Amino acid sequence: MQISCLPISIPSITPRTSIPLLPSLSSNPRRIFNLTSLQSPNHCFFKRLHKSQTGFSNPVLAAMRREEDVEVDDSFYMRKCVELAKRAIGCTSPNPMVGCVIVKDGDIVGQGFHPKAGQPHAEVFALRDAGELAENATAYVSLEPCNHYGRTPPCTEALIKAKVRRVVIGMVDPNPIVFSSGISRLKDAGIDVTVSVEEELCKKMNEGFIHRMLTGKPFLALRYSMSVNGCLLDKIGQGASDSGGYYSKLLQEYDAIILSSSLSDELSSISSQEAINVSIQPIQIIVASNAQQSHILASSHTVEESGPKVVVFTAKESVAESGISSSGVETVVLEKINLDSILDYCYNRGLCSVLLDLRGNVKDLEVLLRDGFEQKLLQKVIIEVLPEWSTKDERQIASMKWLESKHVKDLQSKQLGGSVLLEGYF
């Protein structure tokens, strides 16, 4: 049952915590308005804030409703966990991004996220933040707490020691070392456990980590730009590589990017501009078609300590040597250049996600692209449609005669300035 009411004035009500009247509720977790404090026999519908509202309209409290048999705010707090986890985007591989909040009497008393591999997990930071207030509180965490000793102690034991009353989990950990054992340990300790709250949101955030755990391969996405008549374009849209642009965010999100050797002079400019991750850039993977090209690529670029790392792949017949050149560029020699071997290299380096960027000389990457489709190694496609009509027939996607029809699932689109961005899954 849903009961709605007209906006009402609330100047005479003194809440337990300050009310942020204009900003979004998510702007400051310690200032979340606790509606429970307004409960009275005459106003029982104040139990739950309608989550379609982004905040409060000053000076009135907007649409309220009561929902039967729904626990207050589980989804809201799990979305907060996801927001926290994404603060470490691009920094955690081979670990997942995880966020945690501790809630007591309707207030967030602690929060944390996993910043990078080897550092404490989200639950530890959140429990430290909450201190003694964690006792009898509810812990929300986007991924099942670990139950083993690795580089850090088990998070299950930290939650048990803190005497939390309840744990709400976004998704079960696909890591076979953890899988459901964390849930079992918490239940055995007498803690109430709820699983699969905002599960799809939590899964999407860590699709690279999940794919790596289930398949032993990094998550691989294909990106390209095209004209409105279906020709590949050797550029990205205006502002796409600037801070906040979709391409800059992609470079922040993915652990490695495969590029055409024709872009070798532009490598220093192919980097994420996102402020929170400006010093951590994806590994740039270049495929050299011959020994001369391999030598030029390895010797002509100096890798800065804080800049993108460059790895050149070359075939054995090119008579190159594996190793790192004086300029800091790594050379990897393979029996034969193929996508599967490159992905194995990325997996062994602890990478969760790889972006195949179809720019520059597409012929450089056609073998890898064909491998991706024929061996079903591609999971996602990202297409930027630019407002242009091209007359270059040789760059028509249809010219790739080996390419078979593919069904794209969960296709989404959004307009970015004059371009349209399409994203979907194979």
Curated annotation (Swiss-Prot):
InterPro entries: APOBEC/CMP_deaminase_Zn-bd, CMP_dCMP_dom, Cytidine_deaminase-like, DHFR-like_dom_sf, Eubact_RibD. Keywords: Chloroplast, Hydrolase, Metal-binding, Plastid, Transit peptide, Zinc. PANTHER family: CYTOSINE DEAMINASE FAMILY MEMBER, RIBOFLAVIN BIOSYNTHESIS PROTEIN PYRD, CHLOROPLASTIC. Pathway: Cofactor biosynthesis; riboflavin biosynthesis; 5-amino-6-(D-ribitylamino)uracil from GTP: step 2/4. The N-terminal domain (64-250) is required for the deaminase activity. Unlike bacteria that have a bifunctional, two-domain RibD enzyme, plants have a monofunctional reductase and a monofunctional deaminase, each having an enzymatically inactive domain. Residues 72-194 form the CMP/dCMP-type deaminase domain. This is Riboflavin biosynthesis protein PYRD, chloroplastic. Binds 1 zinc ion. The active site is at E123. It comes from the Eukaryota. One of its GO terms (cellular component) is chloroplast. One of its GO terms (biological process) is riboflavin biosynthetic process. It catalyses: 2,5-diamino-6-hydroxy-4-(5-phosphoribosylamino)-pyrimidine + H2O + H(+) = 5-amino-6-(5-phospho-D-ribosylamino)uracil + NH4(+). It comes from Arabidopsis thaliana. Its cofactor is Zn(2+). It holds the Pfam family dCMP_cyt_deam_1. One of its GO terms (molecular function) is diaminohydroxyphosphoribosylaminopyrimidine deaminase activity. Monofunctional pyrimidine deaminase involved in the riboflavin biosynthesis pathway. Also has a reductase domain that lacks catalytically essential substrate-binding residues. Its main location: plastid. Residues 1-61 form a transit peptide. Its EC number is 3.5.4.26. Zn(2+) binds at H121, C146, C155. It is found in: Plastid, Chloroplast.
